[in-house]
């Protein structure tokens, strides 16, 4: 069982932080059932993924693309129709009620209420 360190992989992926992200993603893929491309040699998934990167059986560019795709989420929003949206928001309730009273009738009632009529 050969010991794999980050230094073995730095020439393939120069940024150590990116290397850790790629190796962790590949380890998750192996845990999910993807077949390792190197002999396991009783190693755990993170060590196997680092060996795959060091031996270039997994391309860093391919791993990077798969990592990006796994983090992209599409959220579908089911928006209601415009007419239904107005009803849902209570637009019908905001309309004033129709008055059957004319201006003349309103003035007469106001004057009567004030005692002038």
From Swiss-Prot:
InterPro entries: DNA-dir_RNA_pol_omega, Pol_omega/Rpo6/RPB6, RPB6/omega-like_sf
One Pfam family recorded for the sequence: RNA_pol_Rpb6
GO biological process per UniProt: DNA-templated transcription
A GO molecular function held by the record: DNA-directed RNA polymerase activity
A single Gene Ontology CC term: DNA-directed RNA polymerase complex
EC number: 2.7.7.6
Matches recorded under SMART domains: RNA_pol_Rpb6
Catalysed conversion reaction: RNA(n) + a ribonucleoside 5'-triphosphate = RNA(n+1) + diphosphate
Domain of life the protein comes from: Bacteria
Keyword terms, alphabetized: DNA-directed RNA polymerase, Nucleotidyltransferase, Transcription, Transferase
First-tier enzyme category under EC: transferase
Task of the protein: Promotes RNA polymerase assembly. Latches the N- and C-terminal regions of the beta' subunit thereby facilitating its interaction with the beta and alpha subunits.
Subunit (UniProt): The RNAP catalytic core consists of 2 alpha, 1 beta, 1 beta' and 1 omega subunit. When a sigma factor is associated with the core the holoenzyme is formed, which can initiate transcription.
Family: Belongs to the RNA polymerase subunit omega family.
HAMAP family for the chain: RNApol_bact_RpoZ (MF_00366)
PANTHER family cross-referenced by the UniProt entry: DNA-DIRECTED RNA POLYMERASE SUBUNIT OMEGA
Protein name: DNA-directed RNA polymerase subunit omega
Organism of provenance: Roseobacter denitrificans (strain ATCC 33942 / OCh 114) (Erythrobacter sp. (strain OCh 114))
Lineage: Bacteria, Pseudomonadati, Pseudomonadota, Alphaproteobacteria, Rhodobacterales
